[in-house]
């Protein structure tokens, strides 16, 4: 699973996921299913935001990579992926500027057009069950919830899906592709079932035990099949800016 994640997702996504797990004392090499889940969630958050801007009239528009957008404002503020201190700093700034109610839990995005925080969910289960779990945890009508599944289903607060059909279809297609590729490699069952995941972890750890006197060889090649999974959705200019913003070392 770890190799699949590193080859499947954008390097920035992988780096952010590793950073988030280490912040909570978790090891991506051991908790590989969680590693995959975090990367998937991060990618959906970025895909949700990418190419969506607000023009000078305050209208939401879609601008593909390469088009001039210097005078446009990004519609969504990405909160997910930041360390907790920086995330709350961003939230406090948004609340002070817009006057919106401060959430009790860290949301994933802020929508400058609708003036609301958004909680994104990606589930391997039934969307309505996961939606209710999110709603019961957040206990706030101010935070908008949008749930996606790997089967193409989705559910959102008051059936308000925020994005246009094409943008949501892009996310659903990506999730379905991840599921299919996991399944073709025998990874999907362990990703869905905790019991199967534990069995797979024991198997992986046993396979990782080095034989006495045997040299360890690591391959950095990407298989042709996995090359088709490499995400092409990120705006290169914004990727560089986000990397600098999200991954910079805190000042001592």
From Swiss-Prot:
GO terms for biological process: viral RNA genome replication; viral translational frameshifting. The active site is at residues 80, 108. GO terms for molecular function: RNA binding. Its main location: host cell. The record marks 202-203, 206 as: Important for efficient shutoff activity. The keyword Transit peptide does not apply. It is found in: Host cytoplasm; Host nucleus. The keyword Plastid does not apply. It comes from the Viruses. The record marks 195, 198-199 as: Important for efficient shutoff activity and nuclear localization. Pfam families: Flu_PA. InterPro entries: PA/PA-X, PA/PA-X_sf. Keywords: Decay of host mRNAs by virus, Eukaryotic host gene expression shutoff by virus, Host cytoplasm, Host gene expression shutoff by virus, Host mRNA suppression by virus, Host nucleus, Host-virus interaction. Plays a major role in the shutoff of the host protein expression by cleaving mRNAs probably via an endonuclease activity. This host shutoff allows the virus to escape from the host antiviral response. Hijacks host RNA splicing machinery to selectively target host RNAs containing introns for destruction. This may explain the preferential degradation of RNAs that have undergone co- or post-transcriptional processing. The probable endonuclease active site in the N-terminus and the basic amino acid cluster in the C-terminus are important for the shutoff activity. The C-terminus acts as a nuclear localization signal. The C-terminus is recruited to host protein complexes involved in nuclear Pol II RNA processing. Belongs to the influenza viruses PA-X family. This is Protein PA-X. It comes from Influenza A virus (strain A/Turkey/Minnesota/501/1978 H6N8). The gene is PA.
